[in-house]
């Protein structure tokens, strides 16, 4: 059995025929791996996984009056769904490997089977549609979908993934149809490029269709970044985003992290701006989007972290189009932080605690946001309001393969000028294999 040694970007994995070892360098995971000269051996030594998940959601929101069946994120709703996820990725055949995954969901219960759901403004709900409360998070005609599936090339310095991939950056947090390139041929540097045609969700708690990120231009959305490490403590990152006819953006982020034994302390500062175009927010007539965020944190590796920070958005259109593919800036979980996502001139102060031991992990975020509603073109500025928000997550493993999860969101405080107060509870049970 002929084998070759390559560098790969993965963590520790072990099966009967091979071992993959990894080390962490400059925030990315790099390691040695066996690459096979035979396609058959690469496929035989791949790894498959799956899960069966029961997941439910209840929102204590506003009740519809009369025969009105239209609902939004603030409406009272409840549902229970079951889903099955399957995934496989091969070992490397020389410089190549493949990955494929699927998820299918079925509705077990809906509090209101006749409710009608629309997209609204929140970009976490792209082109939402459907009937019944489960359509809040699981679009009616998109309940059996291809998940993360791609072809990957890796030669030691360059990684290229093409297909349906998970994009993760300051302004991306979801699956996209596109190409992701990463290169580390320059000393102490990481160069990344991401091209996106469509984006969407295929998760146990959310399944949407995949929609064109730029219906006005066939070029799609492109992100490019350059990150440079200064010694072992500091790094600086510059990036740009182009989505022709909609917006262009640029940003810079500086970070510092010091480690001693198993403990660490760090801070980061980040600024970004969007330049809105003809089909951007307010058709580019109300200025540009802005983001400023600062974060400090301290923690113990693989056990606990405490962090706090500030986030501010632009005074006219908030983040503008920066959040087109989501973000990793907001400390709130995927269903929270609406005032920051949709409001303008937002000022968020927050604290966050994360803890994990054995099979139990939890996270809690508390934040207070002062913000205004977005004004239309030539409309006077709207008044400020404030909303306080707590997000809580508890993930506990009963056994190695059987686990449960609880998520809670609650908003309170302020005058409810733009959003009513609400409580949202998610419950899930997962059998992994």
Residue spans for each PLM region:
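Surface-exposed coil loops of outer-membrane beta-barrel proteins
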Residues: 116-150, 154-244, 322-344, 348
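Positively charged n-region of N-terminal signal peptides that target proteins for export
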Residues: 2-4, 13-19
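Outer-membrane beta-barrel pore domains
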Residues: 62-75, 240-244, 249-433
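Aromatic (phenylalanine/tyrosine) cluster motif
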Residues: 6, 10-12, 32
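Beta-barrel outer-membrane channel/assembly domains of diderm bacteria
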Residues: 27-160, 182-183, 259-261, 354-365, ...
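Sec-dependent N-terminal signal peptides
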Residues: 19-27
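Active-site-proximal beta-strand/loop segments in catalytic clefts of secreted hydrolases
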Residues: 103-104, 165, 311
């Amino acid at each position: 059995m002929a084998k070759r040694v390559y560098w790969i970007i993965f963590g520790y994995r072990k099966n009967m025929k091979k071992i993959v070892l990894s080390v962490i360098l400059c925030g990315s995971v790099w390691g040695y791996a066996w690459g096979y000269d035979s396609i058959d051996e690469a496929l035989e030594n791949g790894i498959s996984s799956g899960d069966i998940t029961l997941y439910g959601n209840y929102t204590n929101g506003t009740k519809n009056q009369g025969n009105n069946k239209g609902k939004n994120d603030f409406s009272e709703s409840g549902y229970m769904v079951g889903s099955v996820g399957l995934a496989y990725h091969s070992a490397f055949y020389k410089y190549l490997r493949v990955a494929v995954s699927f998820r299918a969901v079925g509705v077990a219960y809906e509090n209101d089977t006749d409710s009608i759901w629309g997209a609204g403004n929140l970009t976490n709900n792209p082109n939402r549609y459907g009937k019944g409360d489960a359509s809040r998070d699981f679009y009616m005609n998109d309940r059996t979908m291809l998940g993360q599936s791609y072809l990957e090339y890796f030669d030691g310095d360059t990684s290229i993934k093409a297909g349906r991939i998970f994009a993760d950056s300051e302004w991306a947090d979801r699956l996209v149809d596109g190409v992701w390139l990463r290169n580390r041929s320059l000393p102490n540097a990481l160069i990344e490029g991401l091209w996106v045609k469509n984006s969407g969700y295929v998760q146990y708690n959310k399944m949407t269709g995949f929609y064109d990120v730029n219906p006005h231009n066939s070029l799609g959305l492109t992100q490019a970044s350059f990150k440079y490490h200064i010694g072992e403590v500091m790094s600086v990152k510059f990036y740009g985003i182009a989505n022709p006819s909609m917006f262009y953006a640029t940003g810079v982020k500086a970070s510092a992290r010091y480690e001693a034994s198993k403990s660490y302390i760090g801070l980061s500062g980040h600024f970004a701006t969007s330049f809105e175009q003809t089909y951007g927010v307010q058709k580019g007539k109300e200025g540009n989007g802005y983001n400023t965020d600062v974060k400090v944190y301290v923690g113990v590796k693989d056990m606990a972290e405490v962090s706090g920070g500030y986030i501010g958005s632009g005074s006219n259109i908030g983040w503008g189009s920066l959040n087109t593919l989501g973000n990793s800036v907001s400390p709130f979980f995927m269903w929270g932080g609406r005032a920051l996502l949709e409001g303008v001139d937002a000022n968020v102060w927050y604290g966050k605690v994360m803890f994990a031991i054995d099979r139990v992990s939890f996270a809690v975020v508390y934040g207070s946001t002062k913000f205004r509603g977005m004004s239309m073109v030539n409309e006077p500025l709207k008044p400020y309001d404030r909303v306080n928000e707590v997000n809580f997550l508890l993930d506990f493993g009963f056994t190695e393969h059987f686990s449960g999860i609880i998520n809670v969101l609650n908003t309170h405080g302020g005058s409810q000028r733009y959003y009513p107060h609400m409580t949202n509870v998610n419950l899930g049970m997962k059998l992994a294999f």
